[in-house]
């Protein structure tokens, strides 16, 4: 096997390892943040922001862990394959990734309900049913939280840059 193929395999393995680490690390944190966001929304408005009709608890669901994992994959891919390479600033990252995740939340809710007839989340009094426009702020915050949780962790698995040579003055 030639060196370029081995190098490519190592890079792919490093990216896959990084992605898996992020999914395992960030997904449960996002899920707990969702619980807090729903509780905050409930305290401010008097009703939960969203409910889970199939969950016995109604205000949270373990099924949403899969969606949170998907959002971590999306944010990670945007980070590695777009934002990092183009030097996209944090505010733009928040707006782009958060808005895409918001649209993904609506799409997943629509597909779960209309295609599979297994509604996942229903937003209270929302014209879009599966997400509300106010959720954009939650999603933008989640992208910022992702960045704060993974700063410097994003490059795990990559070779460290060579240390600068020190000059001794003895």
Where are the predicted features?
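Aromatic-rich, lipid-facing transmembrane alpha helices and their immediate juxtamembrane interface loops
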Residues: 1-170
